[in-house]
């Protein structure tokens, strides 16, 4: 980190990038499919390019490629953006994901890949908002369906799946394996709710006091 303050989103991506499941080939492939459904994947002919501003994320994607025996890739750095490019004879499509994701752990790995691919989360001190941008509406609708299976009330706008409720975001973070981030998020959420409740009580007390004063003035 070198003393540089990271965003809430970057912290979450760092945590997810360090999940130690790379020996499980099925989960690796499911997460890889999740990345491929995201908006930050660019396909030109046989060339596939993934771009991100997270160093941890680019390393994670490279590890997935290594595990899948895709060794011929190049990593480039332009300004703040990291990109990785590789060649692929047969690029997986959404139908492959639909057929492959039969088990619970694979569905979770896929959604984690979605978020690492093109997801972001606001600092909950400011507002509750998590979103993932997909390459097309079909991919967005598929992930929306998966989230509904886990009773996570996400919404969709064109090719973006988003959450605006604190409790739903917490469930989503836990689902994809962001356990440290869940604890941070919940701590901020509880403090925020307490502050809102205190403000509500103070406003209510102030309003009642004003009514009492006004009534007393009228009677005087």
Residues covered by each model-derived region:
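Short, mixed-charge, low-aromatic patches
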Residues: 14-22, 96-104, 197-201
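N-terminal basic/disordered segments at the start of proteins
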Residues: 6-39
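Short, Lys/Arg-enriched N-terminal segments with co-localized hydrophobic residues
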Residues: 1-5
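Extended mid-to-C-terminal alpha-helical interaction segments
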Residues: 177-220
């Amino acid at each position: 980190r070198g003393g540089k303050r990271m965003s809430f989103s970057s912290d979450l991506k760092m945590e997810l990038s360090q999940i130690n499941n790379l020996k499980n080939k099925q989960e690796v492939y499911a997460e890889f499919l999740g990345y491929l459904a995201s908006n930050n994947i660019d396909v030109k002919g046989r060339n596939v390019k993934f771009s991100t501003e997270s160093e941890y994320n680019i390393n994670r994607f490279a590890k997935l490629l290594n595990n899948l025996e895709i060794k011929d890739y190049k990593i480039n750095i332009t300004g703040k953006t990291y990109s990785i490019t590789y060649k692929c004879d047969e690029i997986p499509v959404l139908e492959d994901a639909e057929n492959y994701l039969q088990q619970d752990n694979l569905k979770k790995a896929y959604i984690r890949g979605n978020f690492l691919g093109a997801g972001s989360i606001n600092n909950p001190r400011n507002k509750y908002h998590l979103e993932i941008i997909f390459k097309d509406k079909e991919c967005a609708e598929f992930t929306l369906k998966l989230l509904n299976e886990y009773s996570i009330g996400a919404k969709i706008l064109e090719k973006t799946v988003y959450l605006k409720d604190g409790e739903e975001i917490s469930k989503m973070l836990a689902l994809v394996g962001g356990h440290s981030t869940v604890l941070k998020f919940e701590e901020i959420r509880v403090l925020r709710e307490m502050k809102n409740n205190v403000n509500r009580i103070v406003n209510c007390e102030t309003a009642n006091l004003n009514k009492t004063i006004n009534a007393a003035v009228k009677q005087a």
